[in-house]
Amino acid sequence: TFDRYRYTPVFSASGGADYQWDAEDQFVTDMQALTGMSVLSASERVDASTSLGARYLLKGGGAIALNLTNNFTRFLTGDVSELGTGALIGSFTQPLLRDFGSYIETENLMQAERDLLYRLRDFTRFRKTFAVRVASSYYSVLLNRETTRNNYAGLLANNLSLEREQAFQAEGLRTLLQVGRLEQSSLQQDLRWTSSITRYKRSLDDFKILLGLKAEENIALDDNEMILISETGMDSPDLNLEQAMDLAVQTRLDLYNGLDRVQDRARKIEVAANAMKPGLDLSLVARVPDANDGDLGELDFENALYSAGLDFELPLDTKLDRNSYRRALIDYEVATRNYLLDMDNIKLDVVDLWRRMNQARKNYEINLTSVQINERRVEEAELRAELGLGDIQDTVDSQNDLTAAQTDLISSIVDHNISKLEFWRDLGLLYVDDSGQWEEGVNESR
C-alpha cells in the first residue's frame, strides 16, 4: 500500500513562530551632551512562517510540486507594526537519462505487487498441503485403530484355541510342549495388542494437537470413514503419467512463482544497467510573489518569475554500479536454474507418487488374496483342531498370518488413499474450499 501511496498527491503543512527581544546601549550624542548618560533602547518582535505544499510523483520518473509560503513579522516596539512576504512556487523535474522511464520508477511498486501475488500463491499451496497433512494424520489414526482391533481379534482367537488345547492336554491328547507353543503365541499376540494400543493413543493425541485441540479432550472418529476409503480408495486417477507431469507443470502455483522470479531478475538487470547512465535532469520552476503592498494572501501573477534548467552529472566512479550489474546477472542465472530445478523436482514428485499408488494397489491385491488364503487356513485348522487332528503349529501360523494380512490390507488401502491425495496436491488439482472440504482432480470430491 505504501508503494501505491507514493504515486498519489502527498500534502504537507508546516509552521513556526519565534519571539525575539534585543537590548543594546545606544549612545545618543545630544543626550550625552546634555546629561552625560547613555540611553537604553530595546526591540521586541514576533516572527512566524507557514508553508502548505503538495507533491505528486509521476510514474515516468518526474515529480510535480506546489508550495505556498508566507513569512510574517510583527514588531512590538517602534513605528512599523508588521511586515509580510509570501510566494507561490511550482516546480517540475524530470530525469532524462538515469532514472528515466516507468519501468525504472515503478520497479519497487511492481515488485511489491508481485511479492503479494507470490504470498497468495504460497498460502494457497499451504492450504492444500495442510489439508493433505490433516487427512494423512487422520487416516493414520484410523489405521492404528484398525491394527489394534485386528490384534485384539487375533488375541481372542489365540486364547480360544489355547483353552481348547489345554482341555485336550487335560485329557492327555496334547503334550506340554505343544500347548506351550500356543501359550507363547498368545503372549506375543497380547504384547502386539498392547503396543498397538499405545501407538493408537499417541497418534490420536498427535492428531488432536494438529487440530489445535488439547490432548486430554475426547473426540470420536467416524467408523464409516474406513469403510468408505476401502470401497473407493483404490480408484486410480483417469490419466497417464505423461499427462500427469504436463498438468503439474501447467498448474503448480509455486512453479509459476519460480518463473515470475526469473522475470523479476531480468527486470533487475535493466534497472542496474540504467543506474550506470549519466544523470541529466530537466527542471522547470515558476515563482509568483505576493503583492508589494505587504498584504498576505494576495499574489502578483504579473511579476511571476519562470526558470528552466538542466542538471548534468557524469559518473566517473561506477565501481559500485558495475558490481550491482554483475550481481543482477548472477541472480538472473541463479533464478533460472532454480526454476528448472523446481520443474524437475515437481516431475520427480509426481513420478514417485505415481509409483507409490501403483505399489499400494499391488500390495492391496496381494494382501487381499493373502487374507482369503489365511481365512481358509484358519477355518481348516480350527476344524481339524476340534476333531483332535490339528497341529498346534498350523493353528498358530494360520492365525498370526491372518492377523498380519488383515493389517497389511488396511495399510495398503490407507497408503494408496494418502498417495492419491498427495498426487492430486502435487498436480495442483486438489481444491480446498473455505469449509476445509477438498475436491480431487475434476470429478472426484470429498
Predicted segments with their positions:
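Acidic, low-complexity, intrinsically disordered peripheral segments
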Residues: 4, 19-21, 205-235, 241, ...
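Hydrophobic, small-residue-rich alpha-helical packing segments that form membrane-like cores
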Residues: 84-97, 101-191, 196-205, 209-212
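Acidic, glycine-rich loop-and-beta core segments that form the ion-binding/anion-interacting portion
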Residues: 171-238, 242-270
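Bacterial Sec-pathway N-terminal export signals of envelope proteins
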Residues: 1-47, 92-114, 120-127, 173, ...
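Short beta-strands and strand-coil junctions in structured, solvent-facing domains, enriched
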Residues: 98-99, 216-217, 254-256, 270-271, ...
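Amphipathic alpha-helical coiled-coil segments
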Residues: 1-3, 126-152, 160-162, 167, ...
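Small/polar, glycine/serine/threonine/aspartate-rich low-complexity segments that form flexible
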Residues: 14-90, 94, 225-238, 269-274, ...
